[in-house]
Curated annotation (Swiss-Prot):
Biased composition (Acidic residues): 179-188
A Pfam family annotated for this UniProt entry: TPR_12
Residue stretches of biased makeup (Low complexity): 609-619
Subcellular location(s) of the protein: Cytoplasm, Cytoskeleton
Organism from which the protein derives: Mus musculus
Listed name of the protein: Kinesin light chain 4
Subunit structure and binding partners: Oligomeric complex composed of two heavy chains and two light chains.
InterPro entries: Kinesin_light, Kinesin_light_repeat, TPR-like_helical_dom_sf, TPR_rpt
Classification lineage: Eukaryota, Metazoa, Chordata, Craniata, Vertebrata
Family from the record: Belongs to the kinesin light chain family.
GO cellular component, one term: microtubule
SMART domains the record matches: TPR (SM00028)
Top-level taxon of origin: Eukaryota
Stretches for region Disordered: 156-199, 571-619
């Protein structure tokens, strides 16, 4: 057994045993030592028995004792070897356990490294997104500041329409240029008898009641944006008229005008122009070249060309319409003044400022002589003429007109101009002089600087825009305090215009809501040819200096027309007698639907005023 152990120890020194080989050899040695221990144990027992026998006989006792001692030492060595082998086996088992734990820890370390890399990637992506977001926020803030600056620039030349603007009054070209307005509905049967008789005397014709009903019905459908119903309705009526009355009948021309209007509201300008040209040919052949209906169609065709930016083509049409109205109505009729305003607009878009001044001055003279100096058309025409002066650099003439407008509005409000009641521009100039003598304390009450703020009660779209335009003119002249006064007054006027009381006062001041005055002064919003068809001059200055194409009437008239015509239509369909109009009958939708957000903008518009151009160039 000992030889086996020695043989294993004599293996070549250069051969390194693996851990498994060491463990196997240790187990073999341990087994050999156990066997050797058992063998020595048996020999020791035999010697002990021999010693007992020798003690009885007394021979060779010392030799036996010596062998026993050697055996005991050998057994002690064997037991020590066994203990060491057991320790080695236990150590090997512990090392195996430690190695297993080590592998587990390594696996965990690998997973943690992967998770750490994932977290780093996620953090890097989040940081990039955060950086992009911060850049976007900074860019949006810059764009916001830029837009706010542009908005402030536009305030010097924007179109201030107060509450009417919110209700849709600022539509570029409303339906009233082809359809009957409030005056026709108010007159009722008197219209068909009076105007019909006049039409008969002058060789005109009277529009049948069925076409009037169709007018109002198409208005309702168009107001609701239901063109898919309005267009087939017009086409069917047109086919019926052509079949029963013939292609050259005036009623066919009327229906062509209605269908052209619907196409125009859909931005189908080519189709609308084709229909209006057909209507013009029919009316010229049936009613004569100098009939008011021909002038109405010419005006509507000029409107269409103006929308497309064809000012040169529109100007001769508008000029011919003016000649017809001068011949039929006289050179001093208010409707001639409206046509002059339209012609001035077309000329201004072509840069013909001398002609623009001539047309505006003539229109202003007609309004003042026929309607009086307090008529709102006078203020609007003065404002338009002042804007024309601004575009030519005639600042003194423009300033004088602006002051006339504000003074007239002030007189209508307070009755006179005295020390206690001064127009707002006088207060502005006084504050300018005071600011030059001593700086104004921003916290001081307004009473210290006079009652200028009381003049802010004078409010209308025309006056409001005049305040802003005159304020811009003051800024050009370096009168900053005066400009701020007018701008603040314009802001107050705009805020006051949002309540019904202020709106009523504005209507009373400028006569925009006075029906009796409109009847006495003549048609202020439209020109109707004999027979009752409306041929209003829809394209004219808005009266605020913006130079946009806009109808000068009020949407309240359209609402009343729609309300009454709707009730009449319902009564006719039900076969009952018409009753007085009920206040509960309302129009189905607002005319704002006609100005769709994606609709092409009106091209016939004025450029910015000179003050705004300078502000834009300086920025």
């Amino acid at each position: 057994m000992s030889g086996l152990v020695l043989g294993q120890r004599d293996e070549p020194a250069g051969h390194r045993l693996s851990q498994e080989e060491i463990l196997g050899s240790t187990k073999v040695v341990s087994q050999g030592l156990e066997a050797l221990h058992s063998e020595h144990q048996a020999v020791l027992q035999s010697l002990s028995h021999t010693i007992e026998c020798l003690q009885q006989g007394g021979h060779e006792e010392g030799l036996v004792h010596e062998k026993a001692r050697q055996l005991r030492r050998s057994m002690e060595n064997i037991e020590l070897g066994l203990s060491e082998a057991q320790v080695m086996l236990a150590l090997a088992s512990h090392l195996s356990t430690v190695e297993s734990e080590k592998q587990k820890l390594r696996a965990q370390v690998r997973r943690l490294c992967q998770e750490n890399q994932w977290l780093r990637d996620e953090l890097a992506g989040t940081q990039q997104r955060l950086q992009r977001s911060e850049q976007a926020v900074a860019q949006l803030e810059e764009e916001k500041k830029h837009l706010e600056f542009l908005r402030q620039l536009r305030q010097y030349d924007e179109d201030g329409h107060g509450m009417e603007e919110k209700e849709g009054e600022a539509t570029k070209d409303s339906l009233d240029d082809l359809f009957p307005n409030e005056e026709e509905e108010d007159s009722g049967n008197d219209l068909s008898r009076g105007q019909g008789a006049a039409a008969a005397q002058q060789g005109g014709y009277e529009i049948p009641a069925r076409l009037r009903t169709l007018h109002n019905l198409v208005i309702q459908y168009a107001a609701q944006g239901r063109y898919e119903v309005a267009v087939p309705l017009c086409k069917q009526a047109l086919e019926d008229l052509e079949r029963t009355s013939g292609r050259g009948h005036p009623d066919v021309a009327t229906m062509l005008n209605i269908l052209a209007l619907v196409y125009r509201d859909q931005n189908k300008y080519k189709e609308a122009a084709h229909l209006l040209n057909d209507a013009l040919s029919i009316r010229e052949s049936t009613l004569g070249r100098d009939h008011p209906a021909v002038a109405a169609t010419l005006n509507n065709l000029a409107v269409l060309y103006g929308k497309r930016g064809k000012y040169k083509e529109a100007e001769p049409l508008c000029q011919r319409a003016l000649e017809i109205r001068e011949k039929v109505l006289g050179t001093d009729h208010p409707d001639v003044a409206k046509q002059l305003n339209n012609l001035a607009l077309l000329c201004q878009n072509q840069g013909k400022y001398e002609a623009v001044e001539r047309y505006y001055q003539r229109a202003l003279a007609i309004y003042e002589s026929q309607l009086g100096p307090d008529n709102p058309n006078v203020a609007r025409t003065k404002n338009n003429l002042a804007s024309c002066y601004l575009k030519q650099g005639k600042y003194s003439e423009a300033e004088a007109l602006y002051k006339e407008i504000l003074t007239c509005a002030h007189v209508q409000e307070f009755g006179s101009v005295d020390d206690d009641h001064k127009p707002i521009w006088m207060h502005a100039e006084e504050r300018e002089e005071m600011s030059r003598s001593r700086p104004r304390d921003s916290s001081a009450p307004y009473a210290e600087y006079g009652g200028w703020y009381k003049a802010c009660r004078v409010s209308s779209p025309t006056v409001n825009t005049t305040l802003k335009n005159l304020g811009a003119l003051y800024r050009r002249q370096g009168k900053l305090e005066a400009a701020e006064t007018l701008e603040e007054c314009a802001l107050r006027s705009r805020k006051q215009g949002t309540d019904p009381i202020s709106q009523t006062k504005v209507a009373e001041l400028l006569g925009e809501g006075d029906g009796r005055k409109a009847i006495q002064e003549g048609p202020g919003d439209s020109v109707k040819f004999e027979g009752g068809e409306d041929a209003s001059v829809a394209v004219e200055w808005s009266g605020d200096g913006s130079g946009t194409l806009q109808r000068s009437g009020s949407l309240g008239k359209i609402r009343d027309v729609l309300r009454r015509s709707s009730e009449l239509l319902v009564r006719k369909l039900q076969g009952t007698e018409p009753r007085p109009s009920s206040s509960s009958m309302k129009r189905a939708a607002s005319l704002n639907y006609l100005n769709q957000p994606n609709a092409a903008p009106l091209q016939v518009s004025r450029g910015l005023s000179a003050s705004t151009v300078d502000l834009s160039s300086s920025s």
